[in-house]
A protein has these predicted regions:
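Glycine-rich phosphate/diphosphate-binding loop of Rossmann-like nucleotide-binding domains
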Residues: 1-10, 90-178
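Phosphate/diphosphate ligand-binding glycine-rich loop within oxidoreductases
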Residues: 2-89
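Glycine/threonine-rich flexible loop motifs
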Residues: 179-186
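Active-site-proximal flexible loops/turns
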Residues: 56, 112, 185
């Protein structure tokens, strides 16, 4: 999607689909800093999709060109949420004041980015996800991780949590659904 967007804007793309095809791969283990210092000579921006949470943030600290986070492991996926916000804006003609319900696995990076994005608007959001199940020992806790909830509170996001969509769906203006699965971000 990032490549297609650049071509639609009249730009060109130089890239690689796998870090193993670069000096950051298995043999050399080049650092993010060294990789970015090399990449910044190839273009005017870097779109980084990385398996490591926080890698684009680290890359931005070293780069002399803008770094766009195209998804980072279990961390964030802001470009996806920007696309979702744009779709809502096209369909609803506004974002402020809409009541959001986010359903699924809150460990997913898009849910984290949704929370951060909604801090910029007057939008209450309810995160709906299952907690650990006593009937199935070892089942994952899919609720929003504490580190993100702390950030959302610090940024004054109006949010709450629920375990069942039936509790909140009647009040929703926008529903964002993520699968309840174990993604492989490697």
């Amino acid at each position: 999607a990032h490549e297609a967007a650049m071509h639609r804007l009249g730009g060109h793309v130089t890239g690689f689909s796998d870090a193993k095809m670069t000096r950051a791969g298995d043999w050399y283990q080049e650092s993010i800093k060294d990789t970015v210092k090399m990449l910044e000579f190839y273009g005017d921006a870097i779109v980084m999709r990385h398996f490591q949470k926080g890698a684009p943030h680290e890359a931005a600290m070293w780069a002399s060109v803008p770094v766009i986070n195209g998804g980072d492991g279990w961390g964030e996926h802001p470009t996806q949420i920007l696309t979702d916000l744009y779709t809502v804006l096209q369909q609803k003609h506004r974002i402020d004041g809409l009541r959001w319900v986010a359903v699924g696995d809150m460990r997913m990076r898009t849910m984290h980015s949704l929370g951060y994005a909604l801090t910029q608007f007057d939008c209450p959001v309810t995160f709906v996800s299952p907690g650990p199940d006593d009937l199935f020992p070892g089942s994952p806790d899919m609720r929003m991780p504490e580190e993100y909830k702390a950030d959302f509170q610090r940024y004054s996001l109006d949010f709450k949590e629920a375990e069942h969509v039936e509790q909140v769906i009647a009040d929703a203006d926008v529903i964002l659904v993520e699968p309840v699965i174990q993604p492989d971000y490697t």
